[in-house]
Amino acid sequence: MRIFKLMTLISFGIIQAQEIDSLLYSKLYEKGEWKSFYQLNKNNEFDFVQINSRIDSMYFIHQHNVEKSVLKHLFKPILGLSNQNQVEGQLIAIKSAYPFINDGSFISFAKYDKNRIAAVIDFNPVFKSQIGGLLGASKGKDGDWITTGEIDVHLENPRKKGSVMDLKWKQPDAFTRKLYFSLETPFLFSLPFGTLFQLDQNFIEKNYHIESFSGLLVGLSHFGQWRFGGKKESGKDLSINERFNSESVLIGLKTDKRNNRWLPHSGQFFETVLTLGKFNDYLGKTTMFESKFKFQKYKDIGNSVILIYSKGERIFLNSRKLNLAKKVKFGGINTVRGYNEDQFASEWIFIQTFEWLFGDLDQSQSFIFIDIPAVSDYTIHPGYGLGFRQYKGTIALDISIGFSKRDAGGKIHIKFSSGL
């Protein structure tokens, strides 16, 4: 009987010790500590003994997609961090600034030389290089069909440098042509920031032409990717044969926390750009201010998802009325569906979009939408309708049919892209 009682007490003590050990381990795990520990004091209480141990090196797995020097700059912000929670927070910021570092990439940790900590980075990027286009068709008042088009080339990681190139050509109608080119490099030589160059041209026959060039520095912050630089713009109002130009300072922020690069259905996206400078025309110089923003957020509702998408843009010239060249253009698949591409122009615009997504959301999405615009000069009725998106392998397709109170008959918007 005494042996039985002794065995019971020993078993109870072992179980209690295991529970305490598990509790203390979970506390260390919550703190993200690598080398700290709990120590029993003379009062039979556990004291937390913190030992600072910072990450001093990185080791990459699956690094063949990007040059190692680029990877070291991408993940350099985690060096010197002292616990796992700090690293995970920094990794979220890195992913939001460079979305090709998706959830398939993760970090583990290794101890070596007794007191040193290395970050082991399993790098599995998803680069989204593609060529795409846009096709729109609608029936005009004279009964003839009007066709519009766009070509979009997007390249990521050429030459394994982690850079991004965009080339867009657009013809909203028979008289209008647009060209946009940008090149972004994540890091300039060995500096902790990169560069972004943008060229934008816009021409409407017998009306105006306008061209702008931007040069920016880009870098990483806790909120995403920051941007800072300058912009030069020049143009001519062909209707009155008057030239204009401007020089300005530009700042911006971009963060992308969406879950899927082709068909996102969770997370959020935010981008904003502010421009302040001097505008010069035949009346003289004046102050210019421009602002743009985009915000997307996905919310689960049962087996479906609601996309909330807000978009706004404003251009302000002190003591000036905006000519057509400077006004914000909108209408069509990228702004207000149910209308022709760039059918309208205004000094400022705010568009609130709601989409109800359902289906196998990673591969195909059926949706019902409404685009609600608010503009400075007049009233634009909302566009509404339904559509379908699909991604298979390397082919992505976006089709929507939009309606509006203003125009009789619907507008068909088709957008496609193919991976490269």
Give the location of each predicted region.
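Positively charged n-region of N-terminal signal peptides that target proteins for export
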Residues: 1-4
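Small/polar (Gly/Ser/Thr/Ala-rich) solvent-exposed segments
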Residues: 374-376
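Detector for outer-membrane/organellar transmembrane beta-barrel domains
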Residues: 290, 294-320, 336-370
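Gram-negative/organellar outer-membrane beta-barrel architecture
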Residues: 80-271, 298, 304, 328-332, ...
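Hydrophobic h-region of N-terminal signal peptides that target proteins for export
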Residues: 8-17
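Acidic, glycine-rich low-complexity/disordered segments
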Residues: 19-83, 87-91
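Outer-membrane beta-barrel proteins
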Residues: 202-207, 279-287
